[in-house]
Amino acid sequence: MKIPNLYFHVYLAALLMLTAVPAKAADVKELFAIDLADYPGKEGRMIEVSYPPGAQDVVHRHDAHAFVYVLEGQIIMQLKGQPAVTLKAGQTFYEGPTDVHVVGRNASNTEPARVVVVLLKGKGAPIFKPVKE
């Protein structure tokens, strides 16, 4: 009777995969936007990114200079080709216009995290673009 037992375990594994809860997404709120007259074609944006416990970003890029400041909690950040870093409240992080952000997630599964990001980007360009790996 080992065969029915095997079927049960295969069925259970398939059921678990189908009902797995997807990773929580971060919430992005725009705080401020301004045209930069001294930099033709550029604008400044300030956003707040709130990460619920366990939340993570999709792989993306900004096509902008992004200056990140951690307000609350701990965030794990990694740019393509660089090691991951864990940042806590009061620490900063920089992403350049050609960087691909491969990891951006809340380091905690129980506590929220928040960052504020200042972007210097092309006027009218999206704040971020998902990247396929």
Residue ranges and their predicted role:
Residues 1-11:
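Bacterial N-terminal signal peptides that target proteins for export
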Residues 56-58, 76, 93, 97-106:
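Histidine-centered metal-chelating micro-motifs
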Residues 21-25:
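Sec/Tat signal peptide C-region and signal peptidase I cleavage site
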Residues 36-41, 51-52, 81-98:
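Short acidic-glycine-tyrosine-enriched beta hairpin
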Residues 65-77:
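Short, conserved beta-strand element in jelly-roll/cupin
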Residues 9-20:
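Bacterial N-terminal signal peptides
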Residues 27-59, 118:
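A short glycine-rich, His/Asp/Glu-containing loop-to-beta-strand
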Residues 84, 99-125:
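Ligand-binding loop in jelly-roll beta-barrel domains
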